[in-house]
């Protein structure tokens, strides 16, 4: 196997493994990350409405892009026909969750709030 082919293969692998986070206008990723520790209700009062209102940006994103934007989900569920759900805790009391449903190929198809 030639050296050029090896480098080309490595380059393709690196480029395919990068997933940029979707750009949601007004979304502050630092506040999202710190909110459950500080209990300021940023997730429930500001971030979740932004994500719901700009759902066209979120829908169609793959699981890795959502994780790049929101971090690891609080809970995950695998449903029938390989559909997957990510659940994100929105407040310190854990009474409100953001649910993102992915289809079998891993694209976000639904985003909603669950009380």
Give the positions of each predicted feature:
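Sec-dependent signal peptide recognition
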Residues: 3-10
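Residues within mature, well-folded domains
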Residues: 19-115
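N-terminal hydrophobic targeting signals that begin at the initiator methionine
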Residues: 1-2, 19
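C-terminal motif of bacterial Sec signal peptides marking the signal peptidase cleavage site
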Residues: 14-17
């Amino acid at each position: 196997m030639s050296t050029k082919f090896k480098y080309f293969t490595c380059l393709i692998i690196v480029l395919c493994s990068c997933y940029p986070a979707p750009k949601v206008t007004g979304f502050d990723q630092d506040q999202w990350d710190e909110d459950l520790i500080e209990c300021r209700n940023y997730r429930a009062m500001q971030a979740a409405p932004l994500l719901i209102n700009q759902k066209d940006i979120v829908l169609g994103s793959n699981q890795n892009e959502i994780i790049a934007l929101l971090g690891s989900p609080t809970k995950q569920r695998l449903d029938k026909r390989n559909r997957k759900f990510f659940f994100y805790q929105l407040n310190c009391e854990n009474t409100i969750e953001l649910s993102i449903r992915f289809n079998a190929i891993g694209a976000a198809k639904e985003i909603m709030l669950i009380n």
